[in-house]
Regions:
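Short alpha-helical segments that sit at the start of domains
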Residues: 1-14, 60-62, 67
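Alpha-helix N-cap/helix-initiation sites
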Residues: 3-7, 22-23, 37, 55
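Short amphipathic alpha-helical interface segments
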Residues: 6-32
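N-terminal leader/targeting helix
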Residues: 24-25, 56, 64-66
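Short loop/turn and capping residues at structural boundaries
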Residues: 28, 41, 58-59
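Short amphipathic alpha-helical interaction segments
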Residues: 35-46
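A short, conserved structural fragment
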Residues: 48-58
């Protein structure tokens, strides 16, 4: 069940990032995908494992963009 949710949330995050090619902050992704912190990290784990995103820290906040 959790594995399925991770895939769904990863898709929501990917869609939000795909609409914003320059990338988004963690806060912007959560707002665009309508998810909470726990789901954000669950989906990000999926996307990072599949090497679909790049993550950096900008002004002490996570910044994510598609590869």
């Amino acid at each position: 069940m959790l594995k399925e949710k991770a895939g769904v949330v990863a898709g929501q995050i990917w869609n939000a990032l795909n609409e914003n090619a320059e990338g988004l902050t963690q806060k912007q992704i959560k707002k665009a995908a309508k998810i909470v912190d726990k789901d954000f990290f669950l989906g990000m784990g999926w996307l990072l494992r599949e090497a679909k995103v790049e993550v950096s820290e900008v002004a002490e906040e996570l910044f994510v963009k598609l590869k």
